[in-house]
Amino acid sequence: VTGVQTCALPICRGGIGAFPIRSARELDFFLDYVDNPVVQEYLDGREYTIDILCDGSGRPVSIVPRERVVIRAGVIDRGRTVADDRLIDVGRAVARALPLRGPVNVQCRVVDGQPIIFEVNPRFSGGIPLTIAAGADIPRWLVELTLGRRVGSRIGQFTDQMWMTSYETSIFLDQAQIADVQPVEPRASQARGEAA
């Protein structure tokens, strides 16, 4: 802990419940307070997700970096695509280093001009609609690959500076209208409090 800013967080979605650690005493407290914590260096810089699609041989077909401009509860509320060669190179390096197949998203922060990876997820990211809207239809290309079709490299083929904003909306119903709404039972995983 000495000399390095750290944080402790529970294993969860979106870093919810993360705590900055400023001393050995705080570290001891959070190690006792948080079940199975992840302790890592605290990274202060712009956050990015890099959406990657790898073919069956692990070759990256598409790499699309996105800046996570506004994040709420671990989910992107506002973001934009960025044609940043440094981030595209990070995607290439991850694909070379790991045996990846299919969709992958890499989370990183740029600190002092250097991208630092803090997470690699072998799945679609929550912000994949922005990547698709920018012209990188990764789900469609994944289907084509699954059907045995060859998909050529699409790296760099997306609209730079495509913005997305998400929002919640409230729906107001009177008693008669709510009576017509059928209740939805939560899936077993949601009932246990796991991320969907």
Question: Which residue ranges define each predicted feature?
Answer:
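A long amphipathic alpha-helix within ATP-dependent nucleotide-binding catalytic cores
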Residues: V34, R72-D112, I117, N121, ...
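A short beta-strand motif that forms the metal-chelation/ATP-contact edge
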Residues: I52, S62-P65, Q114-F124
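Anionic group-transfer/hydrolysis microenvironments
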Residues: P10, Y42-L43, L53, R68, ...
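Peripheral (often C-terminal) accessory segments that flank ATP-dependent C-N-forming ligase machineries
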Residues: R140-A196
